[in-house]
């Protein structure tokens, strides 16, 4: 299902005054959006598309074959334009922007989309975006972050692709409350759904335990965001072998609570170039085949997902 359907639903209900009038009644967002009580709704979401050609090659057949539900592309990266053209030619697919403020690889780097002079705090001594989130947090103002994420959205629109949603690469936009504020502000200004999680006490505890600085101020910003949210969020687990990776993924699926859960992964086809970019290449190659694996498809169907 395209995120655009969710935003149309949300826009249609926002003028109503009460939760009952809005139809937003239920214990989780799956129920609020009309799924039967107790439903486990999973969004399989491909991240880091546009980062390299190998990522594009992996994501496109997944989407065309309806084996995954959505993907998000990195505007500053060299292969974004190619994927944007593909998205324009395949409007039925849910393609968003993976708003990117870091450039994490050792030798494969990129800089900002906006004028570097306007975002000096986002740029490391080598002239690229910072390797790690902490570099952004320690140097970039919220104003600089807002300039850059809006430049990325504008770049996509100028190429002819209006994204179906936006989310955040490496969680950077959740690393400071003022970053989260400009993220949601951009989402509302452009009328593009942002990936957001319903911050129940259990979810807050989970993400704080993972090292995310979820402050009360950030929770307030999330609560004020009026479009539909996720109930939980996961990454496809790593494994020492493909079989182990699949087995751990099955355990994750069986552990899900009712509601809408997004599970992200980073598919790429195997090449020597990919191996030179990232030492996580093997996990990415496995993730490029696991969701077309008949055993995985059968398992998901058996779980009612």
What would you call each of these model-derived segments?
Residues 16-43:
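N-terminal pre-catalytic segment of deacetylase/amide-hydrolase enzymes
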Residues 53-77:
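A short alpha/beta connector and helix-capping loop motif
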Residues 92-150:
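Substrate-binding cleft of extracellular glycoside hydrolase catalytic domains
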Residues 142-227, 239-245, 254:
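Catalytic domains of cell-wall/extracellular-matrix polysaccharide-remodeling enzymes
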Residues 1-23:
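Bacterial Sec-dependent N-terminal signal peptides
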Residues 32-34, 59-65, 82-94, 111-124, ...:
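Acidic (Asp/Glu)-rich catalytic clusters
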Residues 41-43, 68-72, 92-98, 163-167, ...:
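Structural preference for beta-strand elements that scaffold enzyme active sites
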Residues 194-195, 277-305:
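C-terminal domain-boundary segment and adjacent tail
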């Amino acid at each position: 299902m395209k995120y655009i359907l969710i935003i149309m639903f949300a826009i249609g209900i926002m003028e109503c005054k009460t939760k009952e009038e809005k139809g937003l009644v239920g214990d989780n967002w799956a129920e609020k959006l009309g799924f039967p009580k107790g439903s486990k709704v999973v969004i399989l979401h491909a991240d880091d598309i546009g980062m390299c050609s190998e990522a594009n090659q992996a994501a496109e057949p997944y989407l065309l074959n309806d084996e995954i539900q959505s993907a998000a592309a990195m505007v500053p990266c060299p292969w974004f334009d190619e994927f944007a053209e593909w998205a324009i030619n395949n409007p039925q697919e849910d393609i968003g922007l993976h708003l990117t403020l870091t450039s994490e690889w050792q030798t494969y780097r990129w800089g900002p989309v906006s004028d570097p002079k306007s975002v000096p705090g986002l740029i490391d001594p080598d002239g690229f975006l910072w390797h790690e989130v902490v570099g952004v947090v320690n140097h970039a103002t919220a104003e600089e972050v807002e300039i850059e994420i809006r430049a990325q959205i504008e770049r996509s629109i100028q190429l002819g692709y209006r994204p179906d949603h936006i989310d955040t690469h490496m969680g950077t936009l959740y690393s400071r409350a003022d970053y989260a504020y400009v993220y949601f502000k951009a989402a509302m200004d452009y009328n593009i759904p942002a990936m957001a999680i319903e911050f129940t006490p259990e979810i807050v505890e989970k993400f704080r335990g993972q090292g995310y600085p979820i402050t009360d101020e950030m929770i307030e910003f999330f609560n004020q965001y009026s479009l539909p949210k996720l109930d939980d969020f996961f990454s496809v687990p790593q494994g020492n072998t493909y079989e182990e990776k699949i087995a751990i993924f099955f355990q994750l699926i069986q552990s899900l609570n009712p509601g809408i859960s997004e599970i992200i992964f980073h598919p790429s086809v195997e090449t020597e170039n990919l191996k030179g970019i990232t030492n996580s290449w093997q996990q990415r190659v496995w993730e490029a085949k696991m969701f077309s694996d008949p055993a995985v498809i059968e398992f998901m169907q058996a779980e009612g997902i």
